[in-house]
UniProtKB/Swiss-Prot annotation:
Name used for this protein in its record: Serpin B5
Top-level lineage group: Eukaryota
A Pfam family that the UniProt record links to this protein: Serpin
SMART domains, sorted: SERPIN (SM00093)
Description of how the protein assembles with itself and partners: Interacts with IRF6.
A GO term from the CC aspect: extracellular space
Site (Reactive bond homolog): R340, I341
Organism whose genome encodes this protein: Plecturocebus moloch
Function description: Tumor suppressor. It blocks the growth, invasion, and metastatic properties of mammary tumors. As it does not undergo the S (stressed) to R (relaxed) conformational transition characteristic of active serpins, it exhibits no serine protease inhibitory activity.
Keywords assigned: Glycoprotein, Secreted
Family: Belongs to the serpin family. Ov-serpin subfamily.
Coiled-coil positions: none
SUPFAM superfamilies: Serpins (SSF56574)
Length: 375
């Protein structure tokens, strides 16, 4: 198991739990790999306690060469855009008054080829804001307009992280559109909301996780480079969304165990999942501070001397916007005769809240992490 992948998973789980605390009954969605990449780039320019703090929060203790690790992951993940409607934008914008050191520029050039940009917040704020908004809009094929709200930057901004991630999935097996029906989605024990429910009968990898009374299923996207794992409680058992048990027991070891192929077996499954689109703009600053990332945001305590000789430089803001669309779309559903080994039919009906991850199977990195609680 790759040390960077373990580190990224641990950070993904920490961050997910933080966001769940903030949104106990709402939908949660973020892109851990985008956040990790941007913060790891900031770490290259940080020194002393600031660098150590980033390393601790991102669980880099056992990772030998962080920038090289991200270079490999980024180049692997970037190849996916030729198969999928997937865009992962991770930018670190630095004000030009910082006069970045040549050493910092050269050490980040290869591992973070497109991630670092020098801009002018100080003297040309409105123009710079417009440029960033337009560039993110272009890079996401027009999906994200005006990613920077009026108050997100000022002429005092020194370093800004902007993440924008969107994915419109195409399944390995297409859901027949004629089978999509409006059904009640149970947001808790007593209330329901209507949702368009997609249905298919096919062979999938599925398992039971008894410790959390849950089913898990792997749904591969076309070409199997990415998979969506759904963790679905057997029922809504608590007084909230039914996800309390999962959220409580979730840690990176548990997640690795739950998504391990040995937990699951091929089975013929009658599957029902909601058709949905979730768009979230999150402000991860408070969550990151709760996880121990405190110095980086304060001009009095942050140390970015590996990047610039300017004193009092801090990370001003982290903008993180994600959009995920799950539809019927996919390849032709052809059942392989050999896959009919298990004849008994399992059922997975996601008509109540569930946790999901979208994982890059080659590097096992989590691209998206979310919970779906309400249509």
């Amino acid at each position: 198991m790759d040390a960077l992948q373990l580190a990224n998973s641990a950070f993904a789980v920490d961050m997910f739990k933080q966001l769940c605390e903030k949104e106990p009954v709402g939908n949660v969605l973020f892109s851990p790999i985008c956040l990790s990449t941007s913060l790891s780039l900031a770490q290259v320019g940080a020194k002393g306690d600031t660098a150590n703090e980033i390393g601790q929060v991102l669980h880099f203790e056992n990772v030998k060469d962080v920038p090289f690790g991200f270079q490999t992951v980024t180049s692997d993940v970037n190849k996916l855009s030729s198969f999928y409607s997937l865009k992962l934008i991770k930018r670190l914008y630095v004000d030009k008054s910082l006069n970045l050191s040549t050493e910092f520029i050269s050490s980040t050039k290869r591992p973070y080829a497109k991630e670092l940009e020098t801009v002018d917040f100080k003297d040309k704020l409105e123009e710079t804001k417009g440029q960033i908004n337009n560039s993110i809009k272009d890079l996401t094929d027009g999906h994200f307009e005006n990613i920077l709200a009026d108050n997100s930057v000022s002429n005092q901004t020194k370093i800004l992280v902007v993440n924008a991630a969107y994915f419109v999935g195409k399944w390995m097996k297409k859901f027949p559109e004629s089978e999509t029906k409006e059904c009640p989605f149970r947001v808790n024990k007593t209330d329901t909301k209507p949702v368009q429910m997609m249905n298919i009968e096919a062979t999938f990898c599925m398992g039971n996780i008894d410790s959390i009374d849950c089913k898990i299923i792997e749904l591969p996207f076309q070409n199997k480079h990415l998979s969506m794992f759904i963790l679905l409680p057997k029922d809504v058992e608590d007084e909230s969304t039914g996800l309390e048990k999962i959220e409580k027991q979730l840690n990176s070891e548990a997640l690795a165990q739950w998504t391990n192929p040995s937990t699951m077996a091929n089975a013929k499954v009658k599957l029902s999942i909601p058709k949905f689109k979730v768009e979230k703009i999150i402000d991860p600053k408070a969550s990151l501070e709760n996880l121990g990332l405190k110095r980086i945001f304060s001009e009095d305590t942050s140390d970015f001397s590996g990047m610039s000789e300017t004193k009092g430089v801090a990370l001003s803001n982290v903008i993180h916007k994600v959009c995920l669309e799950i539809t019927e779309d996919g390849g032709d559903s052809i059942e392989v005769p050999g896959a009919r080994i298990l004849q008994h039919k399992d059922e997975l009906n996601a008509d109540h809240p569930f946790v999901y991850i979208i994982r890059h199977n080659k590097t096992r990195n989590i691209i998206f992490f979310g919970k779906f609680c309400s249509p």
